[in-house]
């Protein structure tokens, strides 16, 4: 009779290494913003799209805190990009920010990927 230890070991390893990763919002090249954030800006005729990846270590998982920080970083980056171009954008509607969350239980890293469209003020 064969030992099932290798199969059980593989299944346990797969379960332990499983993690949820957020869905990427863009294929554009990301630029580092700070130690937790990277972003990409895609020009549009009516403004630009901003996509960010935000992640940080959390001993106790609080996805809502990471989601709030992620949306805040996205908003700040959008206004900074507009300021650098010497233009103003319409206020970002938080309801239109697409967001995806994930957590790696082994490393304690909670991640967020978000995207929003910033429209130029007329």
What are the roles of these predicted feature ranges?
Residues 1-8:
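Bacterial N-terminal signal peptides that target proteins for export
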Residues 15-18:
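C-terminal motif of bacterial Sec signal peptides marking the signal peptidase cleavage site
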């Amino acid at each position: 009779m064969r030992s099932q230890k290798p199969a059980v070991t593989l299944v346990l390893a797969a379960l332990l290494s499983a993690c949820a990763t957020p869905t990427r919002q863009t294929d554009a090249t990301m630029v580092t913003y700070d130690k937790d954030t990277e972003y990409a800006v895609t020009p549009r005729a009516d403004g630009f799209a901003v996509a960010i990846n935000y992640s940080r270590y959390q001993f106790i998982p609080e996805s809502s805190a990471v989601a709030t920080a992620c949306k805040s970083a996205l908003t700040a980056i959008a206004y900074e990009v507009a300021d650098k171009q010497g233009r103003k954008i319409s206020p970002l509607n938080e309801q239109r920010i697409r967001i995806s969350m994930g957590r790696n239980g082994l490393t304690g890293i909670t991640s967020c990927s978000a995207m929003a469209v910033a429209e130029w003020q007329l």
